Amino acid sequence: MLRGFAPTGVHVVALASGVFLSGAMFSVSAIMIPTLLDTNKEPAGLTTQWARLYHYGSVLMPSMSVAIAAVYGFASTQYRQSPQGMRCLAAGALTLAIAPYTWLAMIPTNNALFAMAASAPGFAGMQDANEKARDLVMKWVVLHSIRSILPLAGAIMGFTGISSGQEGVVGSAN
């Protein structure tokens, strides 16, 4: 424990949740997608399962990022106009950044995979389609792995905000 630093429950929730979100997101790239690649030899199965995985992730992960950013925002209110409070706000912004990153960096790949999933039954047995599907999924893995780092970066930023001292903390003896 850092000398003079006693995190509140809200700090612990923000940090743990940010790290959890990052790990949950990265596990999709590190565990789930390799499983899909190993068990699907046709583009129809691969792209259809990717689309379902994406659907469930798109429901859960952005909602979690909004909730975590709100907790960081609340944590920032425990500091007066100080660098610690600004770091907590930056942590929330980094956590929320998964949405604009998706829009700016991933939409073309996502759309190509969705289009392939919609027409995948017509690709059965076509080697070119199989390679294209696998290449698109692997590109998505790289992009998603980068996106997965954002909540972790937020947690690191949040940790620096809450661990850099108690000066400015509302209710502290300073």
Curated annotation (Swiss-Prot):
Family: Belongs to the anthrone oxygenase family.
The protein's name in its UniProt record: Anthrone oxygenase CPUR_05435
InterPro entries referenced in this protein's UniProt entry, alphabetically: Anthrone_oxy
Pfam families associated with the record: Anthrone_oxy
PANTHER family: ANTHRONE OXYGENASE ENCC, ANTHRONE OXYGENASE-RELATED
Keywords: Membrane, Monooxygenase, Oxidoreductase, Transmembrane, Transmembrane helix
Chemical reaction(s) catalysed: emodin anthrone + O2 = emodin + H2O + H(+)
Membrane topology: Multi-pass membrane protein
Role description: Anthrone oxygenase; part of the ergochrome gene cluster responsible for the typical purple-black color of the ergot sclerotia. The ergochrome gene cluster produces several ergot pigments including the yellow ergochrome secalonic acid and its derivatives, as well as the red anthraquinones endocrocin and clavorubin. The pathway begins with the synthesis of atrochrysone thioester by the polyketide synthase (PKS) CPUR_05437. The atrochrysone carboxyl ACP thioesterase CPUR_05436 then breaks the thioester bond and releases the atrochrysone carboxylic acid from CPUR_05437.
Entry GO MF terms: monooxygenase activity
Main localization category: membrane
Domain of life: Eukaryota
GO cellular component terms attached to this protein's record: membrane
Induction info: Expression correlates with the formation of the sclerotia and thus the pigment production and is directly regulated by the cluster-specific activator CPUR_05433.
EC class name: oxidoreductase
Record EC number: 1.10.3.-
Residues spanning the membrane: 13-33, 56-76, 88-108, 140-160
Localization, UniProt: Membrane
